[in-house]
Amino acid sequence: MITGIQITKAANDDLLNSFWLLDSEKGEARCIVAKAGFAEDEVVAVSKLGDIEYREVPVEVKPEVRVEGGQHLNVNVLRRETLEDAVKHPEKYPQLTIRVSGYAVRFNSLTPEQQRDVIARTFTESL
């Protein structure tokens, strides 16, 4: 459980009146704000705070969307034969547009190497 606290008494003067979030399950404390000695968002073991007295403060948690990593998907609805024919006969496909790395690009404007790469990456036999 997460508890918000304001330190009211401490051997370390840097901790006096600082605000922390205590995670009782992990035995950790996250610094919200301190005069000195601790960085904002720094996580330390509760034991590092030493002998302290504190008062609990209400904590309001707002949902936060945090995206770390993730994947990117380009969808091109085409047949392999269409792209292969566009490589051989670009004049027949002047408006053929595909998605590459999130951008729309004319297939004919790609280099031959890029065209081969798109064909190789786009079509698979199975998942």
Swiss-Prot record:
Role noted for this protein: Acts as a radical domain for damaged PFL and possibly other radical proteins.
Keyword terms of this UniProt record: Acetylation, Organic radical
Organism from which the protein derives: Escherichia coli O1:K1 / APEC
Domain Glycine radical positions: 5-127
Entry-annotated residues carrying Glycine radical: 102
GO molecular function term, any single one: formate C-acetyltransferase activity
Entry GO CC: cytosol
Protein name: Autonomous glycyl radical cofactor
Signal peptide extent: none
Keyword presence, Ribosomal protein: no
Modified sites of kind N6-acetyllysine: 48, 88, 92
Any one Pfam family match given in the protein's UniProt record, by short name: Gly_radical
Kinase listed as a keyword: no
